[in-house]
C-alpha cells in the first residue's frame, strides 16, 4: 500500500526523495491509526475499515486543508462506521480540515456535518445548518428522508395532510 499512499506525493511533490516519501507514508498511516509496518502489504489483505483508513491516509499524506469524502462509511458495519467517524472528527479538529461529505446515511451526516444540502434528482431542495434541517426539515422530501433514516412515522411524500 506504500505506492498507493505515496502516489499523490509523486504528482504533487515530485522532488521528495524516496526516504522522504516513505517518512510521509509512515506518518499518514500513524495518523489514521494503522501500523506502519503494514505498508508493505497488498490492499486485499486489509479489512473494509482498514481500507477506508488507507484511503484517508492517501489524502492526509498531502497535508490538505479540504477533503472530499464520497460515502466514506458505506459498506462498513456500525462499529467500524463509528471508528471512521471518530477518526474524521479527530483529523478535522487536529488539522482544521474542511470536508465536503457526500452520503446517503443521514446518521453519519448528523454526526459530522455543520452545514447540509439536501438534493433530489440533482437539484437542491433544502440547505442550511445541519442542526436546523434535522430539527425542522422544510420540504416533504427532506421530512421523508429523515423519517426513513430515523424510523419516524410519517405520511408518504406527496400525501395531503389535513
Label the predicted regions.
Residues 42-46, 50:
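Conserved ABC ATPase signature
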Residues 63:
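Conserved catalytic motifs of ABC-family nucleotide-binding domains
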Residues 127-128:
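ABC ATPase "signature
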Residues 56, 84:
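Hydrophobic anchor residue at the start of the ABC signature
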Residues 19-37, 146-147:
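Conserved ABC ATPase "signature" region
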Residues 109-111:
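A short, surface-exposed alpha-helical micro-motif characterized by mixed small hydrophobic
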Amino acid at each position: 500500500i506504500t505506492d498507493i499512499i505515496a502516489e499523490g506525493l509523486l504528482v504533487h511533490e515530485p522532488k521528495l526523495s524516496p526516504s522522504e516519501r516513505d517518512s510521509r507514508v509512515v506518518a499518514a498511516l500513524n495518523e489514521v491509526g494503522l501500523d506502519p509496518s503494514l505498508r508493505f502489504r497488498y490492499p486485499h489483505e486489509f479489512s473494509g475499515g482498514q481500507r477506508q483508513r488507507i484511503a484517508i491516509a492517501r489524502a492526509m499524506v498531502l497535508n490538505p486543508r479540504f477533503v472530499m469524502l464520497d460515502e466514506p462509511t458505506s459498506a462498513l458495519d456500525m462499529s467500524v462506521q463509528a471508528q471512521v467517524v471518530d477518526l474524521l472528527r479527530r483529523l478535522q479538529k487536529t488539522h482544521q480540515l474542511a470536508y465536503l461529505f457526500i452520503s446517503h446515511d443521514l446518521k453519519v451526516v448528523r454526526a459530522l456535518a455543520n452545514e447540509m444540502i439536501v438534493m433530489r434528482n440533482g437539484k437542491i431542495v433544502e440547505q442550511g445548518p445541519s442542526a436546523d434541517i434535522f430539527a425542522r426539515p422544510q420540504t416533504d422530501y427532506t421530512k421523508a428522508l429523515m423519517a426513513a433514516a430515523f424510523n419516524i412515522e410519517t405520511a408518504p411524500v406527496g400525501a395531503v395532510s389535513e
